[in-house]
């Protein structure tokens, strides 16, 4: 039996908690940064703010709290599930006093830190090492809409860690008849796939919003995985990881699925709506690709990696080009070998 604290009560954190709660051998706690959200989940038996319509059955052992100290003192395994721009603050300002050498951490956040271009596991490691802690750390990646995981739809994802024993433990913790985990030791590749696919999903949405057709979508996905792979490999990831669940799998889902917030942002941009208006309409939910684009381009520039699709997504997000102008630019670039 594992004592698990899911730290983050957004859609993805709640879905993970619901999935794990179906396996009765775990003791499980869901932490929310918002006392109001925690109280709402307790009162209504579902997360009406971020994952409405997916009840927490009373028979399932999910304890919801806004008390970080209680959550971390309870936990053996910490599952870190919060927006990328909240990770450093959460670990430095909220979690740090309660972290101990006995903790093991799984990061389920996809993104890059704005100022440093660090992956989420690197951000967490940076905070831990400053406190003299070197904890087992793993990352979760792959095609996994929160709503479908919460509903128990068959899903396959990847867990990556340099600690093979911890990866194997997580594989056992998560795997059941509806969710299959593959293990990997390419932490960089898995995280880069999860972060970069959100940028390409915005581009795919733009194509849909402009009404440009399926050929254009296929081109964006295919050339998108090429530039994702270039940057991931330059950072130390493996090419084959980007061809797996954490790269191509997550990219296809996020570029084509109607539940993708990043794709939705692109669709609405393609239709002519302004970015601020689109983001306001997400109801507090986060489209990570909007923030990740600038960080990915900064990282790519530092490594001499060309990312033309990401660059055009950035110009559209910044209001420097219209969606149609960005697509026309991509189609008029000089010819090259594939």
Curated annotation (Swiss-Prot):
One of its GO terms (molecular function) is glycerol-3-phosphate dehydrogenase [NAD(P)+] activity. Its main location: cytoplasm. GO terms for biological process: carbohydrate metabolic process; glycerol-3-phosphate biosynthetic process; glycerol-3-phosphate catabolic process; glycerophospholipid metabolic process; phospholipid biosynthetic process. Sn-glycerol 3-phosphate binds at residues 110, 142, 144, 197, 250, 260-262. It comes from the Bacteria. Pathway: Membrane lipid metabolism; glycerophospholipid metabolism. InterPro entries: 6-PGluconate_DH-like_C_sf, 6PGD_dom2, G3P_DH_NAD-dep, G3P_DH_NAD-dep_C, G3P_DH_NAD-dep_N, NAD(P)-bd_dom_sf. GO terms for cellular component: cytosol. SUPFAM superfamilies: 6-phosphogluconate dehydrogenase C-terminal domain-like (SSF48179), NAD(P)-binding Rossmann-fold domains (SSF51735). It is found in: Cytoplasm. Keywords: Cytoplasm, Lipid biosynthesis, Lipid metabolism, NAD, NADP, Nucleotide-binding, Oxidoreductase, Phospholipid biosynthesis, Phospholipid metabolism. Catalyzes the reduction of the glycolytic intermediate dihydroxyacetone phosphate (DHAP) to sn-glycerol 3-phosphate (G3P), the key precursor for phospholipid synthesis. Belongs to the NAD-dependent glycerol-3-phosphate dehydrogenase family. This is Glycerol-3-phosphate dehydrogenase [NAD(P)+]. The gene is gpsA.
């Amino acid at each position: 039996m594992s004592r698990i604290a899911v730290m983050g009560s957004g859609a993805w954190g709640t879905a993970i908690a619901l999935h794990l709660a179906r396996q009765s051998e775990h003791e499980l706690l869901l932490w929310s940064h918002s006392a109001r959200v925690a109280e709402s989940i307790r009162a209504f038996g579902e997360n009406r703010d971020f994952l409405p319509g997916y009840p927490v059955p009373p028979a399932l052992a999910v304890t919801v709290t806004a008390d970080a100290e209680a959550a971390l003192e309870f936990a053996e395994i910490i599952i870190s599930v919060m927006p990328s721009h909240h990770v450093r603050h959460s670990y430095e300002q909220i979690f740090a006093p309660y972290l101990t050498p006995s903790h093991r951490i799984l990061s389920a956040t996809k993104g890059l830190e704005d100022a440093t271009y660090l992956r989420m596991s690197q951000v967490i490691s940076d905070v831990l090492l400053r406190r003299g802690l070197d904890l087992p750390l793993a990352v979760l990646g792959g095609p996994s809409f929160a709503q479908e995981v919460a509903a128990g739809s068959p899903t396959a994802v990847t867990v990556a860690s340099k600690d093979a024993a911890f990866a194997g433990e997580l594989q056992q913790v998560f795997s059941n008849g509806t969710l299959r985990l593959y293990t990997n030791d390419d932490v960089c590749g898995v995280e880069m796939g999860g972060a970069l696919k959100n940028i390409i999903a915005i581009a795919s949405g733009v194509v849909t919003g402009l009404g440009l057709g399926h050929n254009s979508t296929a081109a964006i996905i295919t050339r998108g995985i090429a530039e994702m792979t270039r940057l991931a490999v330059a950072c130390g990831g493996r090419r084959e990881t980007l061809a797996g669940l954490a790269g191509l799998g997550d990219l296809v889902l996020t570029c084509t699925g109607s539940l993708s917030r990043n794709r939705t942002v692109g669709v609405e941009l393609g239709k002519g709506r302004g970015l601020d208006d689109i983001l306001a309409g997400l109801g507090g939910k986060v489209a990570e690709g909007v923030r990740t684009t600038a960080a990915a381009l900064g990282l790519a520039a530092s490594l001499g990696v060309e990312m033309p699709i990401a660059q055009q997504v950035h110009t559209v997000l910044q209001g420097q080009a219209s969606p149609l102008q960005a697509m026309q630019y991509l189609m008029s670039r000089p010819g090259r070998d594939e």
